[in-house]
Amino acid sequence: GGVAGASGLALSADGETLYVSDLGSRCIWAVPSGGRERMAGGKGCAQLAAGLPGYPGALAVEEDGTVSVGYRWARSAWLEDHADGALLRGAALRLSESMQERLFQMPEDGICAERFGPDGALLASYGGKALGGVIALCPAENRVYLGVAGETKIQWVRI
């Protein structure tokens, strides 16, 4: 196992679990933080969430173990149909920003952020073109604040 494009890291409140967002595999790994080798897909780790609707980046973990993830780009059916594996998808996500815009632009109804329970259950999805591609996020009380690519104003959604 391994990660084809780690793009976000977040540590659980107890310090025992490191969450890793994987661009190439469109998943979130839960990796034991105390291990000698911290490899997603390796011994003792598990997928918290897989088959995500976009390419995950920003991660945040709340005290209760809820994991929030922001999607920088929408899933590209063309790329995934033509890429032989997660490594090539990870490489494509490192293209120039203008090329990425053309390949992965967020659709009007695209999901740009989600929240998962500690067990991996989907708790909520947030979307819409107005929100765009999320590059940073921060849950606080009854909101999730979102840093959106190309925007000067911080967006937020109610939890």
Predicted segments, located by residue:
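Loop/turn-rich, solvent-exposed surfaces of beta-rich toroidal or solenoidal domains
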Residues: 53-127
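Blade-level signature of beta-propeller repeat domains, shared across WD40, Kelch, NHL, RCC1
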Residues: 68, 134-159
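Structural signal for beta-propeller blades
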Residues: 26-28, 75-77, 113, 152-155
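Blade-edge beta-strand/turn elements of extracellular beta-propeller
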Residues: 1-8, 29-52, 118-129
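Short, solvent-exposed loop/turn segments that connect beta-strands within catalytic domains
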Residues: 16-17, 36-42, 139, 146-147
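Conserved beta-strand positions in repeat-built beta-propeller and related beta-rich domains
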Residues: 2, 11-12, 18-25, 68-73, ...
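A short, polar/proline- and glycine-enriched secondary-structure boundary/capping micro-motif
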Residues: 9-10, 30-32, 41, 79-81, ...
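Beta-rich, blade/repeat-based domains predominating
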Residues: 1-17, 51-64, 109-112, 129-142
